[in-house]
UniProtKB/Swiss-Prot annotation:
The keyword DNA-binding applies. Belongs to the RecF family. It comes from Bacteroides thetaiotaomicron (strain ATCC 29148 / DSM 2079 / JCM 5827 / CCUG 10774 / NCTC 10582 / VPI-5482 / E50). The lineage of its organism: Bacteria, Pseudomonadati, Bacteroidota, Bacteroidia, Bacteroidales. This is DNA replication and repair protein RecF. Keywords: ATP-binding, Cytoplasm, DNA damage, DNA repair, DNA replication, DNA-binding, Nucleotide-binding, SOS response.
Amino acid sequence: MILKRISILNYKNLEQVEIGFSAKLNCFFGQNGMGKTNLLDAVYFLSFCKSSGNPIDSQNIRHEQDFFVIQGFYEAEDGTPEEIYCGMKRRSKKQFKRNKKEYSRFSDHIGFLPLVMVSPADSELIAGGSDERRRFMDVVISQYDKEYLEALIRYNKALAQRNTLLKSEFPVEEELFLVWEEMMAQAGEIVFRKREAFIEEFIPIFQSFYSFISQDKEQVGLSYDSHARDASLLEVLKQSRERDKIMGFSLRGIHKDELNMLLGDFPIKKEGSQGQNKTYLVALKLAQFDFLKRTGQTVPLLLLDDIFDKLDASRVEQIVKLVAGDNFGQIFITDTNREHLDRILQKVGSDYKVFRVDQGVINEMGAEQ
């Protein structure tokens, strides 16, 4: 899928944007805070029905405005045009449409426009809690497996209901707990099996990308831990119930799964330098792209936001070789350093566009500039 053109009104600091894109490489340069990331976030919104950063939709409306609109005009591999519309008014329900037909459920759209975004916020995958790493798995698997997404939604709904019962000041019958625990167990087993299968297939792809970028300087790995691995999830929940009542929430279940990120045999969170951490995250996301490309029906979009920060020259050069090659589809890349972008352009050839971003205004630059 190729994003041919985007139209934006009042999204964050982008007052009015109308630009057409290259089918291969689109470069955006400008100082920090000018709107480069906001443009990528608008593209992300069209794939996931939400911002990559701020989940509160109304807070993404431009200051002193009452609404935002994002429209993307795409072209499928067979030439079929696709129009995606998102509109949000303050104190109103968000609208999401494909070819002017509104979705009844946002989850029906997930996976239609597969996308991978590499951004500075990815540092939370290493530094943050286990929920960040579970979200990474969820974002990947949900884009190619509808059964996974539906099971995850069912599990989270049942988890919320069980937690409500756990907080109750009055006695709750066991049968009522069992209703939600059985739903959690049934949906949770599906989520567990699909996460486990994904990680097993994903690890060698990830290791291959890391080895290329680092030029085999370090060994990395991933391991997946879950309460569902060694026992029936229903039994795990039942056995934990009395302790959960004391705590007021569910201590065990697939919502506590962990994806361990390793440098050698140790957690990269404790062992990794800034450059190693950044290499790890870039390799993780490029592997995500490669995995989705293999499993899906269409090549994902790739958004690279400030990707070269904290990397030494040799690792920057390896990433340039990767993204300039033929294995990636349409790419959107931002940087404050025009020289980084020019090095990529020299390797790509003629199919690219360069844009300057300044105070929310985006202008395409001529080839001679």
